[in-house]
């Protein structure tokens, strides 16, 4: 089965990601909370992608297919079939921002909207952290302050915001997504805790659930894309 990738300048940077980065990102898209392949995954049914299983650059050589998978999850399944492809990344980003109650200015660049989203996500998560989680986070970003308002300027200055959010995603959200249903109350109007434990789940509490897009996939995926973009950018400076 083909993955129809819509040329997207906001996702072109994925070609510069490492094999490990792309493999981790692809798994977030293709596998559900139990570690099983999502029934709606197109990538895992793609003959080219499957034929390269075990190849040391399976994901790097197929970055466009991975990007297409994100576009696929970002669009309504019926609309995807009608137009033959999913949504552009920016539309997915704006959609996720709205669900996370971020009033994004559409005149802002994609990078700027992502920056606001990462900051808001960190703020919301920090409020839900206990002292142990906070200390673990501070250690991960090598910070020696204890208050968020002191921490944020340091993260911005040293370009560590993406590293901090990436730590939260890898240490909590990704792990939790593998063991719990990420959208436990579909139809009840809320992504109540998103089926997620700990401060990450609590930070996403209250996110509206609608049938159009797979928010259990696109919310962590957009956060991860924002982190990857900054990591790649840092290596190219």
Curated annotation (Swiss-Prot):
Instruction: List the Pfam families hit by this protein, alphabetically.
Output: DUF3944 (PF13099), Ubiq_cyt_C_chap (PF03981)
Judging by the UniProt lineage, the source's domain of life is: Bacteria
Recorded hits in NCBIfam families, A to Z, give: PRK10236.1
Q: Family assignment?
A: Belongs to the UPF0174 family.
The protein's name is: UPF0174 protein YaaW
Task: Say which species the protein is native to.
Answer: Escherichia coli (strain K12)
